[in-house]
Amino acid sequence: MQCRSIVHRLYSKVSHVTTPIFYPNAKPHLGHLYSSLLSDVYHRWQLFKGNLSFFTTGTDEHGLKIQCASESNGFDQPKKFVDKLYPEFVQLDKIYGINYTRFIRTTDPDHIENVMKLWELCLKNGYIYMGEHKGWYSISDETFYPESKVIKDPKNDGKYLNTESKNEVVYQSETNYFFRLSLFNKKIVDHIRKNPDFIFPASKRDQILKELETGGTLPDLSISRPSARLKWGIPTPNDPSQKVYVWFDALCNYLSSIGGIPSILSNATEVVSRHYSDKSNVKGQLLIPYPKEVQRNTIHVIGKDIAKFHTVYWPSFLLAAGLPLPRQIVVHGHWLCNGMKMSKSLGNVVDPIDMARYYGADIVRWFLLENSKLEEDGDFQEAKLYETRELLVSKWGNLINRCCGSKFNIERAVMKFSDKANFQFQEIFQNEPIVSERIENLAKLLNKSQEVFDEKIAIFQYPQLLRHVWSIINDANTLVQNSKPWERELDQQDNIIFLAMETSRILSILCQSIIPSLSQSFLDRIDVSKEKRTINYARLGSDKTYGKQSNKKGREVPLKKIPFRLQEEQTNMRS
């Protein structure tokens, strides 16, 4: 009992955050990136605090959708098709600094073993049986829809659509294995009621609860497909005539990536690799201590279109297998483009890699995190992305550039004021209460910032967090602009420069989870040493050694102005 208590204390700070695994049947898009960014910031922040954190992403490579896409693209084997496409998702993650600990593919051998194990446990515990399935199936969604959610296609006579995704459905009758989902209604509802943060935000939790409590008993779920129809999938254990349903397969990745079901059940330490194909590389290996605790502290970050699979099916599979439930499922909206759904036919699909190459990956990271709410769909507007970059240049970049001018001496200011007790500066501006008040307020905001970051990141409220960052940057710029340090005697000048540079230093340290590359450039520009970029130095006056060469002429600015991409393209076309 004492041992269990020690384990709980040791790993109460462990976290495992996941994105959905993505279909590699087309190029990665903004929605893929957004899920990854939400997860990446959370993961980076946990590491920044010194906590143990794991982060899983990857590709969902089985199923009829992949099989059909492979055939239509002229591949004789689906594996060759996904082998060609999955690197594009790895590339997206690399460009945007997505710091995952495991990129899992559902074709990885260790994952296939875990799918088999999950099936065997559910079967052994009496939750899987063979039956006949009749219903409306969507290839695009890889799921069946009830009659109540099927309508005639108004544009194509003889075809039918489902009312949820608006994708085509076809009527099928076949023999499948079924999962006894009907036994889990009350268990799932009870768990959500006892753990109100299990589904977040609250609006999505309430929606799921309403569906579970008013929709009647859940129908049992078909969890296999005939091998004659679905050739590309994991065979069901001991029955090659059936393939495992793609969602039963895909959801299991969250267990495979933290050591697998046997390790979770025994809570035994396991070694996993960042990429299974590179498992012999010791540098890419990661130790997963106490996998059961890691599973209990898992947060799934998902899009609203797959909420049912994660909030109803997945907990039911885990309960049936005797495995711990995750801590939380965070559901976010989708991304539009200029108020319209993105589609190839409209020609408005945003390529996140193109955006990163022109504007910079960290600019796109900031823009997406600032202009989104979990409860709503985001609206991508390239003009607004450009405006975000301009603001970072003119406000944060310019704050650094002005204070690094030859008229000032950052090193002297830091040495003079970093030791001031409680940072009470009123005596320096005795006859200027407005300046004194601005300095005091800025100092308080900076010392409070670490707590604000912790609070907002814990609940994925990134827009609120970035508003806090902007308010501090604006206050620092106002202080410099209105107090005119270039016209003052040295003590007053150094006091103002110290506060302005502490603003940039502290925010750059804290924003490493949000803009990992740009924050390093800002810190490099004011000569903050690499070892002093940790959470221990994100307090006023905690670094007394930076700024030594910052006021030398000829230093490169960390962020420069660029023209609007579409405007530059038009100019190039005319020339």
UniProtKB/Swiss-Prot annotation:
Its main location: mitochondrion. InterPro entries: aa-tRNA-synth_I_CS, Met-tRNA_synth, Met-tRNA_synth_2, Methionyl/Leucyl_tRNA_Synth, MetRS_core, Rossmann-like_a/b/a_fold, tRNAsynth_Ia_anticodon-bd. This is Methionine--tRNA ligase, mitochondrial. Signal peptide: none annotated. GO terms for cellular component: mitochondrial matrix; mitochondrion. One of its GO terms (biological process) is methionyl-tRNA aminoacylation. It is found in: Mitochondrion matrix. It catalyses: tRNA(Met) + L-methionine + ATP = L-methionyl-tRNA(Met) + AMP + diphosphate. The keyword Mitochondrion applies. Its EC number is 6.1.1.10. A motif ('HIGH' region) lies at residues 20-32. NCBIfam families: metG. Disulfide bonds: none annotated. GO terms for molecular function: ATP binding; methionine-tRNA ligase activity. Coiled coil: none annotated. Keywords: Aminoacyl-tRNA synthetase, ATP-binding, Ligase, Mitochondrion, Nucleotide-binding, Protein biosynthesis. It is an enzyme of class 6 (ligase). Belongs to the class-I aminoacyl-tRNA synthetase family. Present with 3120 molecules/cell in log phase SD medium. It comes from Saccharomyces cerevisiae (strain ATCC 204508 / S288c). ATP binds at K344. SUPFAM superfamilies: Anticodon-binding domain of a subclass of class I aminoacyl-tRNA synthetases, Nucleotidylyl transferase.
